[in-house]
């Protein structure tokens, strides 16, 4: 949400969300439910992309190799009121970091970046996201102004609930009329 809310016109609200897990994930990828070009652009920014082949190499994995590395992938696809489609992919076993890719009007190539979130090594401890949150709460108390749009919390919470509902109901499309009015710049 943080990246796409900065587009011209800002956040416009969300119409629907659908989850895909396991075999449904791979079928949706094959069917073009989300952009393979953008997925690859995001994966190419990863600092933790697993190598599918032994040896000293840096070969981008094929879909078949991704399936071997990523046993339980999850995708959440949702459409904004202005028609923008967003997809969040969770591909544990293939990547351990947070990456973003988008088509930008006027650019031939996708924009992609890594969102560096300092994560500890696997199975050691939890990342400390609480201290930055408390810092932002403190700034809000001191200035009387939130450090980010509070509507973002409403939108992301609503998307999480819709994602859980979609998964629980058999990966169906969930209409999110309650999120259509969540608009901000």
Model-derived features: where do they sit?
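Hinge/cleft segment of the Venus flytrap/periplasmic-binding protein
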Residues: 174
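Short acidic/histidine-centered micro-motifs embedded in hydrophobic/aromatic stretches
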Residues: 156
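Hydrophobic, well-ordered secondary-structure elements that form the walls
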Residues: 153, 170
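Contiguous beta-strand/loop segments that form the cofactor/metal-binding neighborhood of enzyme cores
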Residues: 1-124, 128-151, 160-164, 177-185
